């Protein structure tokens, strides 16, 4: 496919090129294709190559075949390219970028063998399509792969392998070029005779010219057949180092030019997509910013107007820009501030100086690939939020700025105004007809990204060109979306501090498969509604008048309590995605939020938990049949749990970073396939619907408190046994526990001893213990999960229950003994001491440990004790139980002696034998040794458990202190956006 034209022999080269190292080696060396002598050009250069000095501008003007290499500019000649760039596909960046763009040759030369010009109207459309970008700001750097030896343009960036091959990009770009070239060949069939006998329409598809590394002067128009080069480089893109253009010194000059080669920088980090003035049809690529004063030089364009635009070149540049935007490195993609779009700048307008440019900045383009960055579902493919790199600040900013544009679509809103709106904004759901751009991490109000989609100043684009471009891009790049998204490597992780944690929830929820955005008709529509491609699995948008306005209830709290924010959607399938703004007008963020029909009443003390009114069971069951939720990052969405029949109407409020596989809800111990060990509570209020307020004093509800702390607490009458609080936590790599804790406190059944007993009445304590033990026995079987550890909360609760029953039995027995017998005061004091210590132990430490056990099963409360914490606390509790047990054992000995007064005397005799231990008989020393061993064991146990207690208290204190600065590390590989 190489020998299309007969004039590809080598042209004579001047001797001054012999010492350069751009000499071509190999059979692929070809001579430049020079322009015909009849194709006159103005002597004024029309292309300002970046870093091209004045020496690069040839004063001689046009080149002709008759002149040959003798008409080369002073610094180089066409021979320098003849071989060096012979085998390239795209116009390669070479140091000798010429003063004019010879892609004009394929269509724009009036004398080119009887060819007719393109209509100026069509060329004007092309001029308006591509923004002026002569500042040299680097907008979209390609990610340079390891290929490419030598100090190339991209060698400054660290090589980073990409997951997709550049040949795929070339192939798709080639398809677009062929489409443009075919349409172009029908319009101008006779414009490419200079390269030989009537090359077919595809011959101009590569119609960007480049100058060789040796030609510092005028460029030589190498119009290589694009079809050939795409296949050629597909076959050898892995060994691109064989390119003869990569020789030695030729590479260090390549930054001075504006051309690309398909085997050069498609895979590099340093090749940036640049724009060009609409009147100057240079290549769309520039590698670097112009040096110093050259950036500010004014070059006059040729006066011929806008005839020089090649449709194939335009198509190639647009498709290349769009494709590179689609598949380039997302983390380096940013909107640069300095791009200036002059939609009216024709070739007659020169490039202005910086001060003039500052005055002339009227239009600021922001071009976004429309098939990738549409923000609303138009059906079809699976859309993803294209902000791959969502660092905490810019993630929120991007979510806030995504819908920042007013209805005119121009990105002129200041970031401060946008930041004021982000709290009432959703990250994915936008108007159907609004052109949205997901602004990459650094947002500047003046910005432009060259792309194949239309500029956001859509009023300047013609309808005809939009239709043609959308047809081509939609057909070519439509099938690419899912594969491109799969091929993109998501960054490793990002972390969100507590402030952005809250903001992400406030910023809105991103919908998943069956979560429809609530779309309403915008007040004014700019652009064409059908001109944005978005591939999302969601159904088509709801018609504007077919749904009620969204209803939302978002509660923002402190960072420690952000987990318990309730995001209560109203009932009905049309309201299932609540949004802070109705999106039915350009005044976004100013909507009055309409709450659910039964307005939820927040708790009077909101630092812990806010429980919203929840609709009845029938409604919840209907909702469960209608939908299934898959919450995602930045979302708190209520879901219906179907783990068991008695809890089927339970609602779950998933906080940020949680995404649950709904089809695995049958498993009690299901794992969340999402990220954070962040908290999320399933709250169900059973009974009276009006009693939606839960007084949560000192985080009692958060700690799962289901029993009274003191016997003197009055019974909360209105909240008696009316409802329960169900909680479930889903953490990554841990178990999900569901416990039902009846919140209302049962009245303490006082079974205290009537009559004048000096023993403190243990009735309230025992009644309270009975109540919470019953609750524990009721709630424990409901959890129904396989415990990963034998010594978990349930195991400790069972052990605690046995200990409590034993101690209560002893207390009751001693109290009956005190009532039945006339006991001396000393024995009564012992009984009071034992019973009082037991009551105190049961009312404080035992309840605390029971609360910790429930807390370990219910991680919605913060902090969640681990099994090691429970074991340490259990050992400490055993010391206290052991002390009480010794007192009861002493009382049992007194009872065995019929409560005689000599029992205390015997007890007094116990200490004296200790000093007489050496002189006592053998039997007594054995007893003393046993007592000493018991004491030693107790002391060792105390030391060991004190250390455990210190560790546990340190862990709890550190967890509590760090509650205000929680950092959630979200591995983005597991996160769906």
Curated annotation (Swiss-Prot):
PANTHER family: DISKS LARGE-ASSOCIATED PROTEIN 3 (PTHR12353:SF4), DISKS LARGE-ASSOCIATED PROTEIN DAP SAP90/PSD-95-ASSOCIATED PROTEIN (PTHR12353)
Name of the protein in question: Disks large-associated protein 3
Assembly, per entry: Interacts with DLG4/PSD-95.
Keywords: Cell membrane, Membrane, Phosphoprotein, Synapse
Keyword set includes Transferase: no
Biased composition, class Low complexity, residue ranges: 53-73, 258-271
GO annotation, cellular component aspect: cholinergic synapse; glutamatergic synapse; neuromuscular junction; plasma membrane; postsynaptic density; postsynaptic specialization; synapse
GO terms (BP aspect): modification of postsynaptic structure; modulation of chemical synaptic transmission; signaling
Region (Disordered): 1-24, 52-96, 137-167, 181-289, 398-417, 529-582, 739-788, 906-939
Protein's UniProt keywords contain Signal: no
Tissue specificity: Highly expressed in central and peripherical nervous system (at protein level).
InterPro entries reported in the protein's UniProt record: SAPAP (IPR005026)
Modified residues (Phosphoserine): 58, 404, 407, 410, 414, 641, 643, 930, 933, 965
Bias kind Gly residues: ranges: 74-87
Gene Ontology MF: a single term: amyloid-beta binding
Pro residues composition bias: residue spans: 538-547
Membrane topology: Peripheral membrane protein
The family this protein is said to belong to: Belongs to the SAPAP family.
Main location: membrane
Compositionally biased intervals (Basic and acidic residues): 1-10, 189-201, 767-777, 925-939
Biased composition (Basic residues): 221-245
Domain of life according to the entry: Eukaryota
Location(s), subcellular: Cell membrane; Postsynaptic density; Synapse
Record gene name: Dlgap3
One Pfam family from the record: GKAP
Reported function: May play a role in the molecular organization of synapses and neuronal cell signaling. Could be an adapter protein linking ion channel to the subsynaptic cytoskeleton. May induce enrichment of PSD-95/SAP90 at the plasma membrane.
Organism: Mus musculus
């Amino acid at each position: 496919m190489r020998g299309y034209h007969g004039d590809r022999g080598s042209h004579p080269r001047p001797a001054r090129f012999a010492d350069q190292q751009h000499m071509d080696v190999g059979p692929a060396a070809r001579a430049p294709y020079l322009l015909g002598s009849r194709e006159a050009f103005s002597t004024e250069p029309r292309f300002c190559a970046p870093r091209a000095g004045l020496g690069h501008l040839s004063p001689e003007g046009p080149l002709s075949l008759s002149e040959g290499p003798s008409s080369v500019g002073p610094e180089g000649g066409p021979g320098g390219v003849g071989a060096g760039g012979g085998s390239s596909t795209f116009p390669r960046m070479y140091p000798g970028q010429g003063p004019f763009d010879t892609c004009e040759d394929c269509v724009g030369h009036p004398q080119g063998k009887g060819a007719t010009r393109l209509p100026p109207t069509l060329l004007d459309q092309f001029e308006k399509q591509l923004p002026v970008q002569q500042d040299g700001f680097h907008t979209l750097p390609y990610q340079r792969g390891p290929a490419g030896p030598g100090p190339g343009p991209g060698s400054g960036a660290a090589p980073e392998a990409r997951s997709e091959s550049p040949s795929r990009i070339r192939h798709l770009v080639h398809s677009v070029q062929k489409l443009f070239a075919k349409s172009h060949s029908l319009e101008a069939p006779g414009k490419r005779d200079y390269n030989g006998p009537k090359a077919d329409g595809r011959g101009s598809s590569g119609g960007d010219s480049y100058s060789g590394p040796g030609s510092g002067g005028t460029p030589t128009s190498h119009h290589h057949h694009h079809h050939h080069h795409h296949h050629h480089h597909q076959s050898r893109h892995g060994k691109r180092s064989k390119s003869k253009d990569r020789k030695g010194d030729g590479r260090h000059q390549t930054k001075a030019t504006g051309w690309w080669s398909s085997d050069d920088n498609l895979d590099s980090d340093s090749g940036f997509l640049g724009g060009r003035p609409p009147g100057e049809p240079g290549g769309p690529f520039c590698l670097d910013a112009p040096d110093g004063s050259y950036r500010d030089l004014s070059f006059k364009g040729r006066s011929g107007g806008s005839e020089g635009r090649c449709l194939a070149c335009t198509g190639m540049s647009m498709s290349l820009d769009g494709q590179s935007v689609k598949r380039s490195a997302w983390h380096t993609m940013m909107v640069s501030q300095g791009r200036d779009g002059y939609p009216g700048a024709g070739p007659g307008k020169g490039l202005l100086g910086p001060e003039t440019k500052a005055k002339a900045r009227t239009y600021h383009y922001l071009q976004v690939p429309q098939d990738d960055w549409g923000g609303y579902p138009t059906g079809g493919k699976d859309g993803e939020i294209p902000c791959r790199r969502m660092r905490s600040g810019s993630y929120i900013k991007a979510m806030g700025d995504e819908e920042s544009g007013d209805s005119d679509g121009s990105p002129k809103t200041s970031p401060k105004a946008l930041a004021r709106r982000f709290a009432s904004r959703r990250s994915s759901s936008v108007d159907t007809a609004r052109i949205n751009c997901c602004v990459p991490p650094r947002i500047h109000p003046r910005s432009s990204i060259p792309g194949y989609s239309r500029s956001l100043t859509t009023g300047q684009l013609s309808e005809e060109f939009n239709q043609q471009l959308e047809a081509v891009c939609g057909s070519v790049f439509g099938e690419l979306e899912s594969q491109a998204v799969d091929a993109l490597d998501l960054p490793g992780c990002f972390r969100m501090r507590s402030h952005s944690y809250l903001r992400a929830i406030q910023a809105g929820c991103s919908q998943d498969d069956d979560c429809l955005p609530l779309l309403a008709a915008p007040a004014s529509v700019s652009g064409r509604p059908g001109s944005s491609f978005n591939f999302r699995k969601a159904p088509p948008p709801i018609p504007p008048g077919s749904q009620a306005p969204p209803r939302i209830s978002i509660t923002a709290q402190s960072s420690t309590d952000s987990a318990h924010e309730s995001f209560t959607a109203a009932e009905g399938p049309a309201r299932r995605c609540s949004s802070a703004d109705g999106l039915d007008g350009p005044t976004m963020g100013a909507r009055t939020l309409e709450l659910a029909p039964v307005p939820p009443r927040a708790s009077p003390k909101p630092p812990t938990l806010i429980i919203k009114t929840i609709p009845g069971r029938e409604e919840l069951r209907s909702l469960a049949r209608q939908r299934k939720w898959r919450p995602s990052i930045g979302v708190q969405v209520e879901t219906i749990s179907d783990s068991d029949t008695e809890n089927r109407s339970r609602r779950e409020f998933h906080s940020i970073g949680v995404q649950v596989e709904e089809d695995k809800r049958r498993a009690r111990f299901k794992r969340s396939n999402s990220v954070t060990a962040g908290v999320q509570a399933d709250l169900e209020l059973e009974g009276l619907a009006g009693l939606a307020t839960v007084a949560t004093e000192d985080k009692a509800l958060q700690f799962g408190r289901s029993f009274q702390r003191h016997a003197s607490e009055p019974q909360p009458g209105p909240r008696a046994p009316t409802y329960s609080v169900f909680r479930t936590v889903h953490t990554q790599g841990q178990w999900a526990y569901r416990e039902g804790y009846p919140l209302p406190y049962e009245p303490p059944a006082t079974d205290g001893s009537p009559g004048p007993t000096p023993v403190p009445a243990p009735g309230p304590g025992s009644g309270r213990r009975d109540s919470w033990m019953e609750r524990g026995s009721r709630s424990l079987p409901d959890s129904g999960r396989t415990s990963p550890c034998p010594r978990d909360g349930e195991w400790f609760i069972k052990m605690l229950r046995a200990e409590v029953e034993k101690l209560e039995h002893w207390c009751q027995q001693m109290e009956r003994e005190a009532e039945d017998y006339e006991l001396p005061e000393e024995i009564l004091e012992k009984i009071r001491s034992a019973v009082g210590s037991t009551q105190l132990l049961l009312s404080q430490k035992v309840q605390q440990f029971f609360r910790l056990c429930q807390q370990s099963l219910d991680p919605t409360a913060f902090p969640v004790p681990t099994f090691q914490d429970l074991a340490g606390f259990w050992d400490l509790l055993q010391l206290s139980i052991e002390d009480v047990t010794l007192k009861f054992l002493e009382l049992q000995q007194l009872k065995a002696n019929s409560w005689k007064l000599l029992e205390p005397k015997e007890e007094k005799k116990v200490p004296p034998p200790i000093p007489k231990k050496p002189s006592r008989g053998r039997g007594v020393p054995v007893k003393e040794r046993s007592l000493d061993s018991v004491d030693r064991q107790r002391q060792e146990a105390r030391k060991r458990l004190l250390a455990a207690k210190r560790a546990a208290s340190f862990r709890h204190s550190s967890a509590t202190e760090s509650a205000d600065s929680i950092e959630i590390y979200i591995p983005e590989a597991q996160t769906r956006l």
